A protein has these predicted regions:
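Short acidic/glycine-rich beta-turn/loop cap or linker motifs at sensory/regulatory domain boundaries
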Residues: 29-39
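PAS-family sensory domains
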Residues: 31, 81, 93-99, 111-113
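PAS and related sensory helical modules
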Residues: 37-64, 71-76
Length: 130
C-alpha cells in the first residue's frame, strides 16, 4: 500500500500547480451539469482579466467572453459534449473583461457514466503570444 502524502506535501504540490498554471498561462475549469455549477481556477480568472473569485461564472457568461463570431462554435462544443459525450479542442478568439482581444485554446473532456454526461472538465490556455 502506498503511503499517503503529508499535509505539507499536499500544500507544496498545490502551490507548485498554481505557479505552473501562472507560468504556462493555462487555467482549469469544471462544470457539473446536474447542479448547473461552473468552477474556474484562479488562472482562468486571470486570463479573462478578472480578479480571482470576484464573480461566479456560469456557462452562459463564459460563452459570452468569446468573440461574437466564436460564441456559436463554443456553445455547439458544449452542447455536443453534454448531449453526446464528445470532447473538443479548439482555438478561438476571446474578449477579456477589459476589452482586450486574445486567442485561447480551450479543451473540454466529458465524464460519461451510463451514457450520460455527469461532468465536464478542461483547460483554457492563452495562446496569443505563442
Amino acid at each position: 500500500l502506498d503511503s499517503l502524502p503529508t499535509p505539507g506535501a499536499i500544500a507544496r504540490e498545490l502551490e507548485l500547480l498554481r505557479r505552473m498554471a501562472r507560468i504556462a498561462n493555462i487555467g482549469g475549469w469544471e462544470y457539473d451539469p446536474l447542479a448547473r455549477q461552473l468552477y474556474w481556477t484562479e488562472q482562468v480568472y486571470r486570463i479573462v482579466e478578472l480578479e480571482p473569485y470576484s464573480v461566479t461564472p456560469t456557462l452562459e457568461s463564459s460563452v459570452g467572453y468569446y468573440a461574437p463570431e466564436a460564441r456559436a462554435t463554443m456553445a455547439r462544443a458544449l452542447q455536443t459534449a453534454l448531449e453526446h459525450g464528445e470532447a473538443w479542442d479548439l482555438e478561438l478568439p476571446l474578449v477579456t473583461a477589459r476589452g482586450r482581444r486574445i486567442w485561447v485554446r480551450v479543451i473540454g473532456e466529458p465524464e460519461v457514466i451510463d451514457g450520460r454526461c455527469v461532468k465536464l472538465a478542461g483547460t483554457v490556455e492563452d495562446v496569443t503570444a505563442a
